[in-house]
Amino acid sequence: MGIPSMRILVAALTLLGLSVTPLSATELRVYSGGAPQETLKLPAPEFEKTTGHRVAFTFAVVGAIRQRLEAGEKADVVLLPAPLIDALEQAGKIRPGSRSRLTRVGIAVVVRAGAPKPDVSTPEAVRAALMQARSITHADPQATPGGRHIAGLLKQWDITDTPQRRITPKSAISGGAELIANGEVDIGLYLLSEVLTVKGVAVAGMLPPALQNYIVYAGAVLADSPAPEPAAEFIRFVADPSREQQWKTTGFESISQAK
């Protein structure tokens, strides 16, 4: 039975009040970077109800996801910045023809909620705000493309880690956002989707166009997935234009802007 037919059957059973457990139901192992974490949690229950499949998420910094997959960990779906999907594809880890561009997200400047928000409307204003900060945090440049971009800007501006200005590379999902929320760090630079819903953190603004570095996310099915059709269905499900508002409310731009 094809996926469309299965979805019709599942819908019919649901209307009749019957339990939905398709014979072909599986648990999809979805490995993702931290940026889409809040977004992906929104459609997952509907996908599970509609298809009968279960979704098990693993969220981590993107560099760690790549290393785990290259080391042989098994997954069905991967959602990562497009360049990392490229690398996995070149390594033979991606099922041919299964990748799909999803959306993109930009880098935001964030401070503790209630603290004065610095002007970040121009490159000069951003540099001034960072120069005045006593402490800065941003994503790990060894683990994420966004972190590498910020580290490059700081180096270009000769903003270094000193006793007077501490710089702490730490991913938002591994405690970086909490450093800002707790007041331990003055200012942070993270992908908007990683900090938008974090309690105690306020967005001062996006990096201006001359400094911005958008991260395009893509999804793909792993070459050794035992459930390639349900895996592909999950990617289509989260990439459907009807989900665009879910992506936007969690910090991403519209799906069409990632094309």
Question: Could you tell me what each predicted segment is?
Answer:
Residues T26-G63, Q67-K74, L79-V105, V111-K259:
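Exported/periplasmic ABC-transporter solute-binding proteins
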Residues M1-M6:
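N-terminal secretory signal peptides that target proteins for export/translocation
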Residues R7-T21:
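Bacterial N-terminal signal peptides
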